């Protein structure tokens, strides 16, 4: 019989985009939860992984794989979850839980839906490593900046009319077609008061025009892109001819060009929403939606997959054709991507629920002042908890375990647990229920 609540050791990934040394929150937490881990101040630490994904699986204190332990003790996953998710019978969790520390921008990317994931896995298993989809949710731990989906079409059109370096890659007939579909003029100079963002969903015709615009930019000749970006950067550095609609994007374009000189992703500041999340705010990214994390520390939860289709801001393989063909081409204000938390339990404001519209996971955020307690109702599936601030005690029946910042705790299915803060506590708990 296995205990229902126990600590596990996560894995840590070092990628170039991670924050360096002790500046990385992922690395700070790893010093507690990964045996013999010490921070190298010259190394970038990007991700703390919690879960059963084979690329960096979590382990128990005796070094047993968490997946092996769960396979031997299926009651920890619970029968309803095992019935719903076939892989759970092998001890796999249907979600992957992470802490990300982002120092430089990640690639402009999207994740495939299930049918496309299977097709890509069948055709290119060396690139796309599994046949699963990867919807994901990000919760800000520090101020977090990201590209999230396409701009409202009226705003995107204004950029097409005013940014000469963008105009080089988009045929004027596409700009005219987009303007016509929106009932907006293309006269110069544009009357900016007409180009207000709206939440009206894009029509099929507008989505097709947007697809052609995005394809034209992302597949443009590399040398021509570099020359256009060089002109843009010189213009911005000289603070010359900057239109009102460009002003908020200047610093970001300069920063992205510093990180990825001459990369087509720099021009995506004119196509994608730039969204800043404050601590505790969350965004949900469904399949086939373009995004790129730019800076900050986040909690991230996703379906168990490592599939990424990239097309910009990256030295890695770019699969432009796949990305262009797969996107939904929804276009709306960035706040449409935000996910509002709700109380997890009536009358308890210590724990908020982030509940995206998918089956594989939900996430709780619990905050307790020193000496406070809260109980979480039994969850009919497995949970992973990471302590991001403070220290305390968790109780399950007669079992009691102390924890500190950085600890990662597994909670088995169907168990009520009580949390008590010894020091002001912040904890995130990812779980699945069927």
From Swiss-Prot:
Q: What does the entry comment about cofactor binding? A: Binds 1 zinc ion per subunit.
Q: What parts of the sequence cross the membrane?
A: none
Which keywords does UniProt give here? Cytoplasm, Isomerase, Metal-binding, Zinc
This enzyme catalyses: D-mannose 6-phosphate = D-fructose 6-phosphate
InterPro entries assigned to the protein according to its UniProt record, in alphabetical order = Man6P_Isoase-1, Mannose-6-P_Isomerase, Pmannose_isomerase-type1_CS, PMI_typeI_C, PMI_typeI_cat, PMI_typeI_hel, RmlC-like_jellyroll, RmlC_Cupin_sf
Q: What subcellular compartments does it reside in? A: Cytoplasm
Q: Which GO terms describe its molecular function?
A: mannose-6-phosphate isomerase activity; zinc ion binding
- What SUPFAM superfamilies is this protein classified in? RmlC-like cupins
Q: Name one Pfam family in it.
A: PMI_typeI_cat
Task: List, alphabetically, the GO terms of the cellular component aspect.
Answer: cytosol
Per its database record, what is this protein's job? Involved in the synthesis of the GDP-mannose and dolichol-phosphate-mannose required for a number of critical mannosyl transfer reactions.
Q: Which PANTHER family match?
A: MANNOSE-6-PHOSPHATE ISOMERASE (PTHR10309:SF0)
| Protein name, per record | Mannose-6-phosphate isomerase
Source organism of this protein record: Cryptococcus neoformans var. neoformans serotype D (strain JEC21 / ATCC MYA-565)
Query: What is the phylogenetic placement of the source species in the record?
Result: Eukaryota, Fungi, Dikarya, Basidiomycota, Agaricomycotina
Q: Which gene encodes it?
A: MAN1
């Amino acid at each position: 019989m296995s205990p229902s609540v126990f600590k596990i050791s996560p894995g840590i990934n070092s990628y170039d985009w991670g924050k360096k040394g002790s500046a990385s929150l992922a690395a700070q937490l790893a010093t507690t939860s990964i045996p013999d881990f010490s921070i190298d101040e010259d190394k970038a630490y990007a991700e703390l992984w919690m879960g059963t994904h084979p690329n960096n699986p979590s382990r128990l204190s005796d070094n047993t794989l968490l997946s092996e332990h769960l396979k031997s003790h299926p009651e920890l996953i619970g029968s309803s979850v095992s019935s719903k998710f076939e892989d759970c019978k092998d001890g796999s969790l249907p979600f992957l839980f992470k802490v990300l520390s982002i120092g430089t921008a990640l690639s402009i990317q999207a994740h495939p839906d299930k049918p496309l994931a299977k097709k890509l896995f069948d055709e290119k298993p060396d690139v796309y490593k599994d046949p699963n989809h990867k919807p994901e949710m990000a919760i800000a731990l520090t101020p977090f900046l990201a590209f999230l989906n396409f701009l409202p079409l009226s705003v995107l059109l204004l950029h097409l009319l005013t940014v000469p370096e963008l105009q080089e890659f988009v045929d004027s007939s596409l700009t005219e077609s987009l303007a016509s579909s929106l009932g907006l003029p293309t006269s110069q100079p544009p009357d900016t008061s007409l180009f207000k963002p709206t939440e009206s969903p894009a029509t099929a015709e507008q989505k097709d025009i947007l697809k052609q615009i995005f394809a034209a930019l992302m597949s443009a000749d590399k040398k021509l892109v570099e020359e256009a970006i060089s002109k843009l950067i010189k213009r911005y550095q000289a603070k010359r001819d900057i239109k009102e609609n460009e002003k908020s994007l200047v610093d970001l374009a300069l920063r992205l060009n510093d990180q990825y000189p001459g990369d087509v992703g720099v021009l995506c500041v004119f196509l994608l929403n730039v969204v800043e999340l404050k601590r505790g705010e969350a965004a949900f990214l469904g399949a086939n939606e373009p995004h790129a994390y730019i800076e900050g520390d986040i909690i991230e939860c996703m379906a168990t997959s490592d599939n990424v289709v990239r097309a910009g801001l990256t030295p890695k393989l770019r699969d432009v054709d796949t990305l262009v063909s797969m996107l939904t081409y929804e276009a709306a204000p960035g706040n449409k991507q935000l996910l509002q938390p709700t109380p997890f339990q009536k009358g308890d404001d210590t724990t908020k629920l982030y509940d995206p519209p998918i089956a594989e996971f939900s996430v709780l955020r619990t905050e307790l002042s020193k000496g406070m307690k809260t109980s979480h109702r039994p969850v009919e599936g497995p949970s992973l908890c990471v302590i991001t601030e403070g220290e305390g005690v968790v109780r399950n029946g007669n079992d009691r375990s102390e924890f500190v910042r950085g600890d990662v705790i597994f909670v088995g299915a169907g168990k009520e647990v009580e949390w008590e803060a010894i020091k002001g506590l912040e904890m995130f708990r990812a779980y699945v229920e069927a």
